[in-house]
Amino acid sequence: DPYRHRTPDAILAECKRNIEVYGANYIDFWDDLSFHSLRSTEQLVDAIIGSDLRFYWTAAIRADLFGNPKIVEERRITIAHKLREAGCVNIGFSLESSNAEILEMMNKKVELEYFNESVRILRLAGLSLSTAVVFGYPTETPQTIRETFDQCAKNAIYPSIGILIPLPYTEMYEYAKEHGYITDEDNYLTNMTERQDLCLNMTQMSDEEFMNCIQEGASALNEQLGLGLNDLIKTGKQPAHKGSKLTRNQNDFSFNYAEATFHEK
Protein backbone atom coordinates (compact mmCIF):
# COMPACT_ATOMS: atom_id res chain seq x y z
CA ASP A 1 0.00 0.00 0.00
CA PRO A 2 1.22 3.56 -0.64
CA TYR A 3 2.53 5.50 2.33
CA ARG A 4 -0.03 8.04 3.52
CA HIS A 5 1.84 11.10 4.72
CA ARG A 6 0.30 12.87 7.71
CA THR A 7 0.28 16.61 8.15
CA PRO A 8 1.89 18.30 11.17
CA ASP A 9 -1.59 19.29 12.39
CA ALA A 10 -2.77 15.67 12.30
CA ILE A 11 0.32 14.48 14.15
CA LEU A 12 -0.01 17.18 16.80
CA ALA A 13 -3.70 16.37 17.25
CA GLU A 14 -2.76 12.80 18.14
CA CYS A 15 0.01 13.98 20.45
CA LYS A 16 -2.46 16.29 22.19
CA ARG A 17 -4.93 13.44 22.64
CA ASN A 18 -2.28 11.21 24.18
CA ILE A 19 -1.23 13.98 26.55
CA GLU A 20 -4.78 14.86 27.61
CA VAL A 21 -6.22 11.33 27.78
CA TYR A 22 -3.23 9.31 28.97
CA GLY A 23 -1.09 11.94 30.68
CA ALA A 24 1.79 11.26 28.31
CA ASN A 25 4.85 13.49 28.62
CA TYR A 26 7.09 11.46 26.31
CA ILE A 27 6.40 10.36 22.74
CA ASP A 28 8.44 8.14 20.44
CA PHE A 29 8.10 8.87 16.73
CA TRP A 30 8.98 5.34 15.65
CA ASP A 31 8.01 5.78 11.99
CA ASP A 32 11.09 7.26 10.30
CA LEU A 33 8.96 8.41 7.35
CA SER A 34 7.53 11.10 9.63
CA PHE A 35 10.94 12.70 9.02
CA HIS A 36 11.43 11.72 5.39
CA SER A 37 12.83 15.11 4.34
CA LEU A 38 14.30 18.19 5.98
CA ARG A 39 11.34 20.20 4.74
CA SER A 40 8.75 17.96 6.43
CA THR A 41 10.95 17.72 9.53
CA GLU A 42 11.15 21.49 9.84
CA GLN A 43 7.39 21.83 9.34
CA LEU A 44 6.69 19.38 12.15
CA VAL A 45 9.15 20.84 14.65
CA ASP A 46 7.98 24.38 13.85
CA ALA A 47 4.43 23.22 14.57
CA ILE A 48 5.50 21.71 17.91
CA ILE A 49 7.40 24.86 18.88
CA GLY A 50 4.44 27.05 17.92
CA SER A 51 1.90 24.93 19.83
CA ASP A 52 1.05 24.94 23.52
CA LEU A 53 2.16 21.32 23.83
CA ARG A 54 5.25 20.56 25.88
CA PHE A 55 6.60 17.03 25.84
CA TYR A 56 9.86 15.18 25.39
CA TRP A 57 10.26 13.00 22.35
CA THR A 58 12.59 10.77 20.39
CA ALA A 59 12.55 9.89 16.72
CA ALA A 60 13.90 7.43 14.18
CA ILE A 61 15.33 8.93 11.00
CA ARG A 62 17.33 7.91 7.95
CA ALA A 63 21.06 8.50 8.15
CA ASP A 64 20.95 10.73 5.09
CA LEU A 65 18.45 13.20 6.57
CA PHE A 66 21.14 15.32 8.22
CA GLY A 67 24.13 13.61 6.64
CA ASN A 68 23.70 14.46 2.98
CA PRO A 69 26.50 16.93 2.11
CA LYS A 70 24.53 18.10 -0.95
CA ILE A 71 22.25 20.01 1.42
CA VAL A 72 23.66 23.27 2.76
CA GLU A 73 25.33 22.63 6.12
CA GLU A 74 23.87 25.74 7.76
CA ARG A 75 20.34 24.55 6.99
CA ARG A 76 21.02 21.11 8.45
CA ILE A 77 22.47 22.64 11.61
CA THR A 78 19.56 25.08 11.99
CA ILE A 79 16.96 22.32 11.80
CA ALA A 80 18.97 20.14 14.20
CA HIS A 81 18.81 22.95 16.77
CA LYS A 82 15.06 23.25 16.17
CA LEU A 83 14.69 19.58 17.06
CA ARG A 84 16.23 20.28 20.44
CA GLU A 85 14.07 23.38 20.93
CA ALA A 86 10.94 21.34 20.15
CA GLY A 87 11.70 18.87 22.95
CA CYS A 88 13.63 16.17 21.11
CA VAL A 89 16.07 14.37 23.40
CA ASN A 90 17.30 11.52 21.22
CA ILE A 91 17.60 10.69 17.54
CA GLY A 92 18.12 7.17 16.26
CA PHE A 93 19.43 6.12 12.85
CA SER A 94 20.98 2.82 11.88
CA LEU A 95 24.54 2.14 10.85
CA GLU A 96 23.70 -1.57 10.28
CA SER A 97 27.23 -2.37 9.00
CA SER A 98 30.31 -0.54 7.79
CA ASN A 99 31.13 -3.14 5.14
CA ALA A 100 30.17 -2.12 1.59
CA GLU A 101 29.40 -5.66 0.42
CA ILE A 102 27.11 -6.32 3.37
CA LEU A 103 25.37 -2.96 2.94
CA GLU A 104 24.72 -3.85 -0.70
CA MET A 105 23.23 -7.19 0.34
CA MET A 106 21.00 -5.27 2.75
CA ASN A 107 19.96 -3.04 -0.14
CA LYS A 108 20.80 -0.09 2.10
CA LYS A 109 21.11 2.89 -0.22
CA VAL A 110 22.76 5.28 2.24
CA GLU A 111 26.43 6.21 1.99
CA LEU A 112 28.55 5.39 5.04
CA GLU A 113 29.81 8.98 5.08
CA TYR A 114 26.24 10.15 5.65
CA PHE A 115 26.20 8.35 8.98
CA ASN A 116 29.37 10.10 10.14
CA GLU A 117 28.06 13.47 9.01
CA SER A 118 24.70 12.98 10.73
CA VAL A 119 26.48 12.24 13.99
CA ARG A 120 28.52 15.44 13.65
CA ILE A 121 25.56 17.70 12.79
CA LEU A 122 23.18 16.38 15.44
CA ARG A 123 25.79 16.53 18.17
CA LEU A 124 26.34 20.19 17.36
CA ALA A 125 22.75 20.66 18.55
CA GLY A 126 23.45 18.75 21.76
CA LEU A 127 21.22 15.80 20.91
CA SER A 128 21.72 12.30 22.28
CA LEU A 129 22.16 9.71 19.53
CA SER A 130 21.47 6.01 19.20
CA THR A 131 22.17 3.53 16.45
CA ALA A 132 21.84 -0.14 15.63
CA VAL A 133 23.99 -2.72 13.87
CA VAL A 134 23.13 -6.12 12.42
CA PHE A 135 25.61 -8.97 12.21
CA GLY A 136 25.25 -12.29 10.44
CA TYR A 137 24.94 -11.74 6.70
CA PRO A 138 26.51 -14.54 4.63
CA THR A 139 29.69 -12.55 3.91
CA GLU A 140 30.19 -11.57 7.56
CA THR A 141 33.70 -12.30 8.87
CA PRO A 142 35.68 -11.43 12.00
CA GLN A 143 37.16 -8.56 9.97
CA THR A 144 33.79 -7.07 8.95
CA ILE A 145 32.60 -7.30 12.55
CA ARG A 146 35.70 -5.39 13.69
CA GLU A 147 35.17 -2.79 10.95
CA THR A 148 31.64 -2.11 12.14
CA PHE A 149 32.70 -1.72 15.77
CA ASP A 150 35.57 0.52 14.63
CA GLN A 151 33.05 2.74 12.88
CA CYS A 152 31.04 3.00 16.10
CA ALA A 153 34.21 3.84 18.03
CA LYS A 154 35.10 6.52 15.49
CA ASN A 155 31.76 8.19 16.23
CA ALA A 156 31.81 7.45 19.99
CA ILE A 157 28.47 5.69 19.86
CA TYR A 158 27.50 2.32 21.36
CA PRO A 159 24.99 0.45 19.18
CA SER A 160 22.03 -1.74 19.80
CA ILE A 161 23.45 -5.06 18.57
CA GLY A 162 21.26 -7.39 16.57
CA ILE A 163 21.76 -10.72 14.84
CA LEU A 164 20.23 -11.19 11.40
CA ILE A 165 16.88 -12.97 11.59
CA PRO A 166 15.46 -13.62 8.11
CA LEU A 167 11.72 -12.94 8.25
CA PRO A 168 9.08 -14.42 5.94
CA TYR A 169 8.52 -12.66 2.60
CA THR A 170 11.96 -11.00 2.64
CA GLU A 171 14.83 -11.58 0.23
CA MET A 172 17.06 -12.95 2.99
CA TYR A 173 14.38 -15.45 4.00
CA GLU A 174 14.23 -16.75 0.44
CA TYR A 175 18.05 -16.77 0.32
CA ALA A 176 18.18 -18.82 3.52
CA LYS A 177 15.74 -21.37 2.11
CA GLU A 178 17.45 -21.59 -1.28
CA HIS A 179 20.90 -22.09 0.27
CA GLY A 180 19.81 -24.69 2.80
CA TYR A 181 20.02 -22.61 5.98
CA ILE A 182 16.28 -23.03 6.58
CA THR A 183 15.15 -26.56 5.82
CA ASP A 184 12.17 -26.80 8.18
CA GLU A 185 10.18 -23.56 8.16
CA ASP A 186 7.85 -24.52 10.99
CA ASN A 187 10.77 -25.44 13.24
CA TYR A 188 12.65 -22.25 12.36
CA LEU A 189 9.67 -19.96 12.92
CA THR A 190 8.48 -21.55 16.16
CA ASN A 191 11.98 -21.40 17.66
CA MET A 192 12.75 -17.89 16.48
CA THR A 193 13.04 -15.50 19.42
CA GLU A 194 14.32 -11.95 18.93
CA ARG A 195 17.05 -9.96 17.24
CA GLN A 196 19.60 -10.24 20.02
CA ASP A 197 19.64 -14.03 19.96
CA LEU A 198 21.43 -16.22 17.44
CA CYS A 199 18.54 -18.02 15.74
CA LEU A 200 20.24 -18.78 12.43
CA ASN A 201 23.92 -18.62 11.47
CA MET A 202 24.49 -18.00 7.76
CA THR A 203 28.16 -17.02 8.09
CA GLN A 204 31.15 -19.30 7.51
CA MET A 205 32.03 -19.00 11.21
CA SER A 206 30.96 -21.45 13.87
CA ASP A 207 28.29 -20.22 16.28
CA GLU A 208 30.92 -19.91 18.99
CA GLU A 209 33.39 -17.95 16.86
CA PHE A 210 30.64 -15.69 15.52
CA MET A 211 29.27 -14.76 18.94
CA ASN A 212 32.76 -14.45 20.45
CA CYS A 213 33.73 -11.93 17.75
CA ILE A 214 30.66 -9.85 18.59
CA GLN A 215 31.25 -10.10 22.34
CA GLU A 216 34.90 -9.11 21.94
CA GLY A 217 34.04 -6.14 19.74
CA ALA A 218 31.30 -4.98 22.10
CA SER A 219 33.54 -5.39 25.13
CA ALA A 220 36.37 -3.41 23.53
CA LEU A 221 33.97 -0.62 22.52
CA ASN A 222 32.42 -0.55 25.99
CA GLU A 223 35.88 -0.14 27.51
CA GLN A 224 37.00 2.43 24.94
CA LEU A 225 33.94 4.61 25.53
CA GLY A 226 34.13 4.13 29.31
CA LEU A 227 30.49 3.07 29.59
CA GLY A 228 30.81 0.44 32.30
CA LEU A 229 28.11 -1.79 30.79
CA ASN A 230 27.54 -5.22 32.30
CA ASP A 231 25.22 -6.57 29.61
CA LEU A 232 26.84 -5.92 26.25
CA ILE A 233 24.23 -7.41 23.97
CA LYS A 234 21.07 -8.41 25.82
CA THR A 235 19.44 -8.69 29.20
CA GLY A 236 18.02 -12.14 28.66
CA LYS A 237 16.78 -14.51 26.01
CA GLN A 238 13.08 -14.58 25.25
CA PRO A 239 11.64 -18.08 25.66
CA ALA A 240 10.94 -19.99 22.48
CA HIS A 241 7.42 -21.20 21.78
CA LYS A 242 6.80 -24.48 23.62
CA GLY A 243 3.17 -25.11 22.73
CA SER A 244 1.55 -27.14 19.99
CA LYS A 245 2.36 -26.69 16.33
CA LEU A 246 1.11 -23.35 15.01
CA THR A 247 -1.07 -22.82 11.96
CA ARG A 248 -0.03 -19.73 10.03
CA ASN A 249 -1.15 -17.51 7.23
CA GLN A 250 0.48 -14.46 5.66
CA ASN A 251 -1.04 -12.15 8.28
CA ASP A 252 0.34 -13.99 11.31
CA PHE A 253 3.53 -12.00 11.69
CA SER A 254 3.67 -8.56 13.22
CA PHE A 255 6.99 -7.44 14.70
CA ASN A 256 6.85 -4.26 16.74
CA TYR A 257 9.69 -3.34 19.11
CA ALA A 258 7.72 -0.43 20.61
CA GLU A 259 4.84 -2.02 22.46
CA ALA A 260 2.92 -0.06 25.07
CA THR A 261 -0.25 -0.47 27.09
CA PHE A 262 -2.32 2.61 27.87
CA HIS A 263 -5.09 3.04 30.39
CA GLU A 264 -7.55 5.89 30.14
CA LYS A 265 -7.97 8.04 33.20
Model-derived features: where do they sit?
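Short, flexible micro-motifs
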Residues: 1-3, 97, 139, 165, ...
